[in-house]
Regions:
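An active-site-proximal structural segment forming one wall of the substrate-binding cleft
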Residues: 160-194, 222-230, 255-269
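Conserved, mostly hydrophobic/aromatic
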Residues: 73, 143, 196, 226, ...
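Substrate-binding surface in catalytic domains of secreted glycosidases
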Residues: 89-112, 201-360
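Glycan-recognition patch characteristic of GH18 chitinases/ENGases
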Residues: 35-181
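Active-site groove signature of glycoside hydrolases
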Residues: 146, 175-213, 276
Length: 441
């Protein structure tokens, strides 16, 4: 990138930061009008477990101003049983019905300030999402199935025509029709569609996942069955129910598990992994979410946003159906001894962090700048990192996020997705940056 472009980007980022900092939380109607004028998808993952240690109830999406700047919320996650059905609670580590729809939410955590009443049919996150949608009528909520920990039995669900039909029917019954255990119909209207987060068809994910060579073809067939049954349900509700999927950044994973062009026949759009390229599992520090492969990268080939997006386009994906994933967290290393700016240097392991070693929220990382850590940038590669001489964090700050929104627009992509909304600060600074970058100006 030529120097004048660096200066221009810096000026734009400075202006954006001023606008974001100065802007008060927008009224729901104004935010909704603006987000839909732009035409880009803005997808945010809300984590089921965020209400606990992270103290992130659904209400914060409203009070921070995030909800008025999103088009979709993906609720993470719904589980898949060994016999290939959607279910909400199979025991410890297999679901959390309490968080989903049983926990009575007190008034101070409620979107509308009203506590859940004893004996009401729907409580918990699901009821709060329904209240959030009432305040933001254009906002859609999708149930995201699977994720890293709950993709174990996707292969079973997708294996045969009969298993696919039964699986899809169970998911629509549970989430779209809202037939929750013990409360038939109580959850109707909370979810508008389905997001498939199978990690990964015919490729290693979490240890213990069932993997079969035929997963690749079966994933396409599963999408077709979801589209068929969602459309049938939509004819009754007189509504289009969206179907989306989370797709990998690794070209080898793309080839092993996905039939490129075919899958987009059934998808409204797909979110593309734009992060976790590197982390504390690597012996050397690196970038976790760079726009382009940095000069001097020790890995060849290496991963980047551009590598991921170009990989899907080369395999037949329509540009407008690709939604770029942006992380609201960073990856970190400690015990770095190579000096310099810390990048591409040996480390002893993952950096200490609040919830998981080597993984820290943006809202925490932003406080490190000026407190012993120096912010470093590679504008050509589109990434930033913090370094204090021994510990390094690679992360996306507002400057990097804004650069990625400009890339989304220039590349003709369909929008941005974020993992996950609880990583942002109380002002929804990163979500506001996406909003600014994807709004015509």
């Amino acid at each position: 990138m030529r120097p004048f472009r660096h200066r221009r980007l810096t000026a734009v980022v400075t202006l954006a930061a001023l606008l974001i900092t100065a802007a008060p939380p927008a009224a729901a109607s104004a935010g909704d009008d603006k987000q839909h004028r732009s035409g880009y998808h803005r997808v945010g993952y809300f984590t089921q477990w965020g209400i606990y240690g992270r103290a992130f109830p659904v209400k914060k999406l409203d009070t921070s101003g995030a909800a008025s700047r999103l088009t979709h919320i993906n609720y993470a996650f719904g589980n898949v049983s060994e016999d290939g059905r959607c279910y909400v609670d199979g025991g410890p580590g297999e679901g959390d019905a309490w968080a989903d729809y049983q926990r009575p939410v007190p008034a101070e955590e409620s979107v509308d300030g009203v506590a859940d009443a004893p004996g009401q049919a729907l409580n918990g996150n699901f009821n709060q999402l329904a209240k959030l949608k009432a305040k933001h009528p254009k906002l859609q909520v999708l149930i995201s199935l699977g994720g890293w920990s709950w993709s174990t039995y996707f292969s079973n669900a997708a294996r045969t025509d009969a298993s696919r039909k039964a699986f899809v029917a169970s998911c629509i019954d549970l989430y779209l029709k809202g037939n929750l255990p013990g409360s038939p119909g109580a959850g109707a209207g909370v979810f508008d569609g389905i997001d498939l987060d199978w990690e990964w068809p015919n490729w290693d994910g979490e240890p213990g996942n069932v993997i079969r060579p035929e997963d690749r073809e079966n994933f396409t067939k599963l999408l077709a069955e979801f589209r068929r049954q969602l459309d049938a349900h939509g004819r009754k509700t007189r509504t289009h129910h969206p179907l989306t999927a989370f797709l990998p950044a690794n070209p080898a994973t793309m080839d092993a598990g996905y039939e490129g062009r075919k899958i987009f026949t059934y998808l409204d759009f797909a979110t593309v992994q734009g992060y976790d390229f590197h982390g504390g599992w690597d012996a050397k520090t690196n970038q976790q979410s760079a726009l382009r492969v940095p000069t001097g990268s020790p890995d060849n080939p290496d991963f980047s946003v551009e590598v991921a997006v170009d990989g899907w386009i080369a395999r037949g994906a329509p540009r407008g159906k690709l939604v770029l994933g942006i992380p609201y967290y960073g990856r970190g290393w400690t015990g770095i001894t190579g000096g310099g700016n810390g990048l591409f240097q040996p480390a002893t392991g993952p950096a200490p962090a609040t919830f998981e070693a080597g993984n820290e929220d943006y809202k925490k990382l932003k406080t490190l700048a000026g407190n012993g850590f120096t912010v470093h940038r590679d504008l050509r590669a589109g990434h930033a990192w913090l370094f204090d001489g021994t510990t390094l964090w690679t992360y996306d700050d507002p400057a990097v996020v804004l650069q990625k929104t400009l890339y989304i627009r220039r590349a003709g992509l369909g929008g941005a997705m974020v993992w996950s909304l609880d990583g942002d600060d109380d002002n929804a600074t990163l979500t506001r940056t996406i909003d600014l970058g994807l709004t015509t100006w």
